[in-house]
Amino acid sequence: MFHQFFGENMLRADVCNAVEELGQLLDHTGPVLQSERNAARIFNADHLFFVTNGTSTSNKIVWHSTVAPGDVVIVDRNCHKSVIHSITMMGAIPIFLMPTRNHLGIIGPIPKEEFEWKNIKKKIDANPFIKDKNVVPRVMTLTQSTYDGIVYNVEMIKEMLDGKVDSLHFDEAWLPHAAFHPFYKDMHAIGA
């Protein structure tokens, strides 16, 4: 309605299109569009959009387009602060997957048992903020890879949670190179 009232020209004049020949990140045109399509091809993705604010903003985009207030979400307890911020902003109810710690207190991997539905269900049942104990969690967010280089088998996790969670979100800020080396087969979500 806003767009219909003011029109295309007024809204386009409100953003900087300093060099039209170079394309625009906001409307995905010209060389920017060509570059995004090429990156999507390289990463074996259906679509790819450049985000210039980093993966913190990317995480928030995922959450704001997926999660509604009161939704139950499953989150890696070692997740990035942008995910915690998104939980707060969206008013979601988190269920945390707990990583291990070694004798020095360094955070390790999340044990496979934490991903088993029976254990997630126990956490849902024990959470006093969740009224519908048969709720389907809206999203599961997992840091892939962690700051310490811990990676998870994405295919195994997808298989374990198939049909149990609406969306799987792997925060791969530290793993963009995984698609380019066979060592990481099944260890990244991009193009999986």
Feature locations, PLM:
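Conserved PLP-enzyme active-site core in the AAT-like
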Residues: 27, 38-42, 55-192
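Conserved N-terminal alpha-helix of the aminotransferase class I/II PLP-enzyme fold
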Residues: 5-57
